[in-house]
Amino acid sequence: MDIPLVVPMPPNWRIDWAVWEAAQPELFADMQRTVDAPFNGDAAHVLENAQTACERLTGLSEFRSLTERQRQIVFLACFFHDVGKTLTTKRIKRQWVAPNHDLRGAELSRYLLWTDYKLAGTMDMLSFREAVSLLVLHHETPLMFQDVLKQGDAESLFSVKSLAANGILVPDFTLELLGVLGLAIATTVDEKEACNRFMETAEKNGYLHEPPKFADDTSRFAFLSRRSNDSDVVVADDTWGEIIMMAGLPGTGKDTWIGRNHPELPMISLDEIRKEIHVLPTEPQEPVVSLAYSRAREFLRNKTPFLWNATNISTDIRNRQLSLFAQYGAAVRIVYLETSVDEQYRRNRNRVAVVPEEAVTRMRRHLVLPTIHEARRVEYIMV
């Protein structure tokens, strides 16, 4: 099934739900089984909530004035905006809750677009897929923007500028699309007003349609990590050198990229440490990680640039390493590699140490790409 088949088009803007459900019956069933009434008054389940929001979206002039590609991105994000509730909804003390449904929804939408629609392996497909995922992740931000405004102009400016910065790596993501999504899922007058204020603030400061510009990588990272309050100030680089952190699923060619681009750097490779101490990828990894961190600290104490070679597919894992590197005054460059689904599986099967395909699938399901906020330099490279 192609994406255009499920996205309403002019002149009638009709949504053919039957076509979509026939292509993804399990997803529709999961959404229909998940209760939503406690969260969205009139909707009995998540599927009804999603369909109602999509119908509202197609009637918005703001949606109809977008380009076809933008409409596809926003429409998919609108349908997926609460899909994370299928994984997180539970009853605690007689109340229904869905903690972190935005994060899990972003992961699930990325996984579905990657596996079902094969949106991987080119920058064009990555940008489309990640724009949808980012919209799902941040779908509640416009609805709650009134709370941000109460914190003052400086905080509201940082909020929109920091969010818009995602467009540096993901050009298809804009605050205009996030605002339009907000208008579609808003169910109260206050939420709609908050969305309008969000878009007005973004447009006033020049970030509605494009990401902000910064003097250089150091100044950008200082602002986004809140070490600098003024995004227009050039911040001096006080680091002694750069650590390269690799990221990407098994079989994306990290070793090959390293050999071609930085054979001169000493490397900490979790794969090599596993071989060294005879630990399988499916076994507990604490001994592997402990030895890797010990060697990293030695390089850092000696102010020796090095390369950290591992999958690094989650924000939590990366943050632990980034925190360590920052403690020693090092700058970091994150290099994320991606290839198509079929090519990634082929390369993994040809590895000396093959990672079981079910493990790779599990990793892809929970993969979170590094963002521009995480390090001084972040690169997406298609291989």
Task: Label the predicted regions.
Residues 242-262:
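Glycine-rich phosphate-binding P-loop
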